[in-house]
Amino acid sequence: MSILALPELLPPTHTVPKCASMDLLNGSAYTWEQRKLGEVADIVGGGTPSTSNDDYWDGDIDWYAPAEIADQIYVASSERKITQQGYDNSSAKMLPVGTVLFTSRAGIGKTAILRKEGCTNQGFQSIVPHINELDSYFIFSRSEEMKRYGETVGAGSTFVEVSGKQMANMELMMPTTMEEQVTIGSFFSNLDSLITLHQRKSKIGKMPLK
């Protein structure tokens, strides 16, 4: 969602954060700078344990596949789980809380924020924010921008895929301070909560009366 469109979407009691309205809406870049994603985050791929070894599966380690990333903002439990043995014998990497999962194939650009550490298959190039350099919800709020970038630069003989190196080279305009990032991230978090609440009320209102 473009920040330029936000004032028209918000209720009267909600306003665009000052740092966003002052700098983006008025075209000033005083408190913003251009950074490469790889400068403020690690881009981490995934892997899959052998599916023919039962000892690798049905453990207690969350292991995500692109198909289970949809419209949710946060994820805390995967559909399939792997064992420590399966993890040790694959290229999967443990991702900390706050990681933004980013699907890199089979539909580039689906995102979700980890609420519990876990790992993924090779269909992801996940974004692990550097402490005090990148706010999880701030970068999550740039999902559409990252999706467009991934679809543009991705290449593959069978299907489009974006690599970790390509994601790390993505250039973003971002606040120079974490305080501004957190302010914007919190704003979008509250906005998403309002939208979710409105959608729930809308569904309830459309339910047939018995």
How would you name each of these model-derived features?
Residues 3, 39, 182-194, 198:
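Extracellular/lumenal glycan-associated surfaces
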Residues 6, 18-21, 208-210:
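Hydrophobic topology marker
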Residues 11-12, 30, 195-209:
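Extended intrinsically disordered, low-complexity coil regions enriched in Ser, Thr, Gly, Ala
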Residues 155, 176-178, 193:
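Loop/turn elements at beta-strand to alpha-helix junctions within RNA-recognition modules
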